[in-house]
């Protein structure tokens, strides 16, 4: 597990109001170096030349070397021969990620989205692996062609590998799970695995043009058919740490559960309010609690969030570990927390009937659900009840007598919450909020932890209440910190590229829908109208899916460009500091706002640089966690389907590709592949622009959303693969197999 990568000067902003930062901080050194190259873009400079020209002190050479290493790692500079450094674009260099093909060649996916992918031949691919971040040089040939040469490996995408053990001529090999990575020789070790066993390995040496890579076994995990081995394999491959370092545990154990009287006296005491938490049945950490009151035609919403920043100070081992993880990871049957349990389930969790320190946002709304004003306070609360979404639904919708009696003192409070939440939602809907309303699967486990059913996850009025209140709080914090001119880590969501929507237009037209593309940018409300027009119709699910795929991913950054999906001009993440590091960053800025801190120019410059790094790091860790979560869900679905071999199910086509199409089963929300090679009645081709697969001789077509009947023919749970065979289509045509 990596630790926080920023020097003390960066976290200093959260520790004191005044700053006496010296110029010898790495973030500022990077800025000075880039400024030098901005004025001398064609130059190739050594560290010594940079020291002299940029005005560094003689004893700052090591600082320059460290800063150059970071700039090269980020692709902002490139190291050339004889220890010279230069700007990449002046050397005709392109930065990107390697995407390998099982046949040995690969492609560079440029960071610049306007560039086409670049082909990497087998010779170049010997030096790299799938996922590596590299810098390449594109050499134009006299006949109009081009050759791509790898100049520098910036970051390795593979450090740990998982696969099965095999032998050839007495020598051990790792056959990686990922088919895009070839077999890798293993160094002889003390432990010799059995053939076919799952082994975890670390790369000892990366490949060169002359020699293959080499790895060594770090753990023999067991049989590939063992469900727990399959689950642990995902945890290993994603480098997720299931334990905390001793120093982190030591700091966590020293946190006092007692709240000092002077701390309570310094805060607003909200313990008299009937504040409650509302979470899922299996939730163990509670970071938000809510309360609503109404005076006349005005509503006042209190959103109280666990004051994690009070317990996790900057520069500590706790903070560094939280930075490194950046997020908690949630699997269907387990979780890997960002903070140790002593904090996440203990003093930071808003457990019922216990005093807790919180940060509270108080928002006043008018009768239409429009925000009138908001204010921030550091507070102390005592949650009156640990409510679940199900029990709130039983109060508001089912009117369950037993539940009504149990929570009779809170019934009016829940009704008021529902009233306000629906008003807020109507305001968001009016400005163009996107609601794709795609069903989510919930995996049900038996007492032995084996998946026994997959059902549609419930979403009720209680979910709507919490969602609306959390969005309102996040917007209020973002607005107020922005108005105070404080740098902030925004949660931003860029709108879809016009090209992506133009490519989608013919398919939408085939369903009878048209998306206005007259303007350069499509407004959220236009996509919202499209979603609304398909509501309740047969094509709703496929239309929602293709539109969602055209969307970009939300990220964290200090530049505010708004949030397209929420149709919000100013948004951040504030409400989940137990499980998200960006929220902890925002909490620290919350404290600066309460103190009325003013930033000096050099403080602002360094803080913005820190927020840029924090945004990049936490966005990457979020994507990493989401990938791991998706893969674990796919594994559990494959495990569930193991006893469904040879059974037939109805479903619909969700994805088309040149090798087949994916079908999601109506009953279980499980997706599997129908390979084109299994369709023996014709030879089929994939027409990407038309969104169809079509037979060459008979013209039979498969489209997104088509209803089909399939048989389960193969399952490889270790690889989370499920293969279907087509039985018939919605028009009654059957496979001739």
Where are these regions (language model features)?
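Short, low-complexity interaction segments enriched in Ser/Thr/Pro/Gly
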Residues: 2-5, 733
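Phosphate/ribose-recognition catalytic cores of enzymes acting on nucleotide-derived substrates
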Residues: 7-9
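Charge-lined substrate channels and their catalytic hotspots, especially those that engage the 3′ end
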Residues: 11-302, 309-358, 391-394, 691-693, ...
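Electropositive polyanion-binding surfaces
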Residues: 200, 205-207, 233-240, 247-681, ...
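A short macromolecule-binding patch
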Residues: 115-121, 181-186, 669-686
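The catalytic Nudix box helix
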Residues: 1-2, 13
